[in-house]
Amino acid sequence: MSHRIRHLSCLACRRKKVKCNRQYPCTRCLKYGEACTYDERDNRKKRHSLSYLHSLESQLARLESFIMTLKNSDPEGRDEMLKSVVFSDHLTEPNDQEVKSEGPIEYPVFLNVQDSKTVSFYGPTSAYDLSLPDITKDNKTTWNFQASYSPMVSECLKLFFRYQYSQFLFVYRESFLSDYYYNFHDGFYCTEHLIYAICAIGASMSDDENISRHSKSYYDASWQKLLEFGLDRSHLTSVQCLLCLGYYDIGMGNTSLGWLLSGLAFRMGQDLGFQLNPENWYIDNSPAISSADSDIRRRVFWGSYVADKFIGFIMGRPTMLKRSDASIPGSNQLPEFAGLEEFKLNVTDYMSLTDFSVCDAVALFVDLSDIADSILLNMFSPTSKNRATNINCVLSNLGKYNLELMNWHYKLPDTISWRTIDLKKDRIPNLCAVSLYYHLIRICLNRPFLSRKEVTANDLTPKTICTDSINEIVTVIRAHRTANGLRYSTLYIVYAAIVSCSVILLLRDMCTDSELLTLNNDMMFFIEVLKECSQTWKLAQRSIVLIENTLKGKTNSQSTSEFVSPISDTENGSSSQQVSEAKDIVEPSDVLDELQKFDLLPENDDNFQTFQAFYGGPPIILSPNLYEKKLNEKTL
């Protein structure tokens, strides 16, 4: 007698509908001397596949639409429609050998474990055989870095997290500082090269010259320590370090190097599989990564995702990280610890005003980044279908994205929807950064269409949308300047000012006298903003020169005295000379003569020869006039 338990009752018990013990032979058949046979086919599990059901629903919808059209057609039209019907593409039922389960298909995933927290990821198409030993492991020694608690380093860290955190969300403040002060994660999230990278950014905005002059030294030290650590040794802090250095270079006007470093960071992150949910990874029936480490990886990925979209958008270049490749959940907030208040800005007001958290800011940045990426792909990509059609299709797509941005703003919960009164007081720094990003996207989307009179969304023209966003940007920057000063500005402020100036330059030729007065005031405001930001970011300093070079080309037809606010500084920032600003009216020739005394533009760099090529953004692909000219040629 076999003791193997079957999944189904024997045929005799099933026929008589009595209980069977599912052994062979079963006790009932053995008792009554009947033949005990089993049918191994389990028809209970024979169900239609999910794809078959979806296809059937789709075909049913098409059939219903066809019948309704047929009903409303004239006799001749019905005959033509019936002749066109073909049933050769009908759906077929999958046979018994097809998919057995409705669950997701499990693809092979390979994890190369480097240490208790670092895992390299290889997907199902990987050509690497991970059963082979990793020859690089023995050549690397584990680090034993002890954090330096010098007052200068501490001050740089405080400046970074107080004023720049909304721009560097891929650095998880709680995990970094808990490792820096308490070695909570055994120093895993606080490596030497990351500390120096953060200090380079923090030192650049210090009012103390003894600290600010070390900014470039911190940058060089970070890069050197990163090379010693090993670029072939993928690590989360190396991803964060590369992104910090990339942002630093972009802020100093070295856009090509910043682009390369950020791209290297994203590739290293993908090597770590940081876009995937590590909670599904098991090694020897144990989680490959702890829950706390998983939460930190979430923040690093989504912060990197926002950085990728922002950098790609302001440069008008393709992005690397795709939403469709990510399975990792949203970011969670780690517990705070004593002393963290020193690294926050306006802690009392911030906490009492709203429950808006850093995780909320990350979620909003991610949503806006998705919209920005879609705009870049579908509106300004050289292979975009809309670019290949006439202007009406382009304007229709423009209206769609304007409406999407408006709906996103209007649907924000009351607890996180920004109000003008909140922006004026600058009491929620992260929310103000989100607001600047939102208006930056709106302006870059509508800037190539300023001369169009067509209404694109909610009875608004591209010109109206851009001017409204400029007014909001002025409100935010004024509040930040009053509360903190523009020495501590982020690149969101710098690029918002640059893009606003570009719109004002375009609007000068299509405005009334009353509008021109407002544009003059706004231009003066933004030039002063860039001048103050140039103390931290050389990008702002160079942009002023290029704005003035653009105005130089217009002096033959219109005086630029209302716009020009002279500045001067040397290229390496080691010394500066103050240009007299006592004149109430500055003649264009006087300003240009002063500017020629200083070498503010990089040598042999064609990227900085024109303002349009410098400020980046989607319109860098085609200038506004050329963009519309090509579209009109398509319609002829």
UniProtKB/Swiss-Prot annotation:
Pfam families: Fungal_trans, Zn_clus. It comes from the Eukaryota. It is found in: Cytoplasm; Nucleus. GO terms for biological process: DNA-templated transcription; regulation of transcription by RNA polymerase II. Residues 10-36 bind DNA. The keyword DNA-binding applies. This is Uncharacterized transcriptional regulatory protein C757.04.
